[in-house]
Each structure stands twice: as structure tokens, then as C-alpha cells.
Design a protein with these regions (language model features):
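N-terminal secretory signal peptides that target proteins for export/translocation
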Residues: 1-5
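Bacterial N-terminal signal peptides
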Residues: 10-20
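A conserved hydrophobic position in a structured secondary element of the catalytic/binding core
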Residues: 213
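Cell wall/extracellular polymer interaction/catalysis modules
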Residues: 25-208, 216-254
Length: 254
């Protein structure tokens, strides 16, 4: 991929300190008190591609659900542990590129993308109006793996064209970055370009690893997420949610 003078961006858009850590991260880790917005996605089990999502806001130490639960789809093969904010243990199975699973765990929310420039004024998230020079690099052999790139030239090589962000696809008319495998640096082959986006066939189809939701839901998320509130997305199977809820400082769900 030819990249001279291109603008290269990591996915990560850091809102501030999003986690609390000590030398014993497994025992002490929890969502930071500064995280005031939370989206929780829960699947029945590790192999399910269907989830229920809920939005929460926090005042003081209490979480309050915002709006009604809504449905989503994830990887066709279900979930697998991703690389986000939560600590990792030696027995975790990692997500890998092309495995058909969505990353589970806790993740920051990053920049958003869309086809309509008008959304820049309607969201508080950093917003990119997508054009033909915008790439999301999913090639594990590239030094730009799991990064957003804006070329200073129209795509020329087969590699550049393959990494182009989708154009004129209603499923990708709006999307929001889920910060999987971004910090401290992306690890090659551990999964890339994980996003919220619009679902296909009215929710009848799973994804390759992203979280897909309805048109109405993606617009709600675009208008609701506020970087000042350090939003986080937690995606887990129910068994892991119940096991980690109190330790991670997560809300009760019905």
C-alpha cells in the first residue's frame, strides 16, 4: 500500500482515564467512575449471534437505564474474548481475524463515520464523512493494521482498493468505532475494524464480528454518545456478565 503523505489515524479516541488499575489488575479492575455512559450487549451464550442491548447513564454511583432494550446481531459464530479495557487471563481464547466472532469484553467508543456530512453537527463523537480515499485497514500484514487512513490520492493499488471503506452501502451509512485491539498498539491478526453499524435484512443476518443494530438504534447511539462522559461498550454472554457484574461495576439487568 502506497501511503506517503496519507493521514494515518489509530482508531483510539481517548476521552481520559477509562480504567482503574493496580498491580493486581484482575482483582481490582473496574469501570472508571468517570465513565457516565454505558451500552451493555448480552448474548444467551458464547455461540449466539443475537444480543439484547441496553443504554445506561450514571449519576453518582448509580446506573440508570435510558430508553428501552433493543436487539442486535454479532458474529455468525458468536463471541470470543477481545482486547479492550478489561484485564486478560491466560485461559482466555483470543479473537482472530476472520474467525466470524465478535470480541467480548469492555471497550471504549471511538470516532464515527458516515456518508452524510450533516451528521457532523448531530453527533458529539468525532465524525468522518466517508469518501473514496478513506480506508480501514484489515490486512494483518500491513503496518497500518486496524487503523483508519485517509489517502492523499485516489486508491490505486489492489491493496488500497481492498481496504476502502464501503461506499453507498446502506448497512454502512453510519458506523461507530468499538475500540477493540487498538491500545497500546494493534496486534496483527487479533481482529480489526470492529464497529456498530446498521444490520442487514432487518436483523435476519449476523455479522463478521461487528455489532449491527437497526437504523433507528444507530441514529440513537450517534446522537447519544458523548465523549465527555467517556462511553464504554460491554459485550458479554450472560454467564460472564453475571460473573463480572459486581467486580466490573456494571448495572443489574432484567
Amino acid at each position: 500500500m502506497r501511503i506517503p503523505r496519507s493521514r494515518v489515524f489509530g482508531f483510539t479516541f481517548v476521552f481520559g482515564l477509562a480504567v482503574l488499575m493496580s498491580s493486581n489488575v484482575e482483582a481490582s479492575w473496574k469501570l472508571a467512575d468517570s465513565t457516565k455512559q454505558l451500552v451493555v450487549g448480552v448474548a444467551p451464550d458464547w455461540n449466539s449471534s443475537s444480543i439484547v442491548l441496553r443504554r445506561f447513564e450514571r449519576s453518582g454511583k448509580s446506573w440508570r437505564q435510558v430508553g428501552e432494550p433493543f436487539n442486535g446481531r454479532v458474529g455468525a459464530k458468536g463471541l470470543v474474548w477481545g482486547r479492550g479495557l478489561n484485564p486478560r487471563t491466560s485461559d482466555m481464547t483470543d479473537k482472530s481475524e476472520g474467525d466470524g466472532r465478535a470480541p467480548a469484553g469492555a471497550f471504549r467508543i471511538g470516532r464515527s463515520f458516515g456518508y452524510e456530512g450533516s451528521w457532523k453537527a448531530k453527533t458529539k463523537l468525532p465524525y468522518v464523512t466517508v469518501g473514496p480515499r478513506d480506508l480501514l485497514v484489515e490486512d494483518p500484514t500491513s503496518p497500518l493494521y486496524n487503523k483508519y487512513v485517509r489517502l492523499d490520492h485516489d486508491p490505486e493499488t489492489a491493496s488500497e482498493k481492498k481496504q476502502q471503506m464501503k461506499q453507498d452501502d446502506p448497512t454502512h451509512r453510519l458506523k461507530i468505532t468499538i475500540e477493540h485491539n487498538t491500545t497500546p498498539v494493534p496486534i496483527a491478526g487479533k481482529g480489526s475494524a470492529i464497529l456498530f453499524h446498521v444490520w442487514r435484512a432487518g436483523g435476519a443476518k449476523p455479522t463478521a464480528g461487528c455489532t449491527s443494530v437497526s437504523d433507528a438504534a444507530i441514529e440513537t447511539l450517534m446522537g447519544w454518545f458523548d465523549p465527555a462522559k467517556e462511553p464504554v461498550y460491554v459485550l458479554l454472554p450472560m454467564s460472564e456478565y453475571e460473573a463480572n457484574r459486581a467486580r466490573w461495576n456494571l448495572p443489574l439487568i432484567g
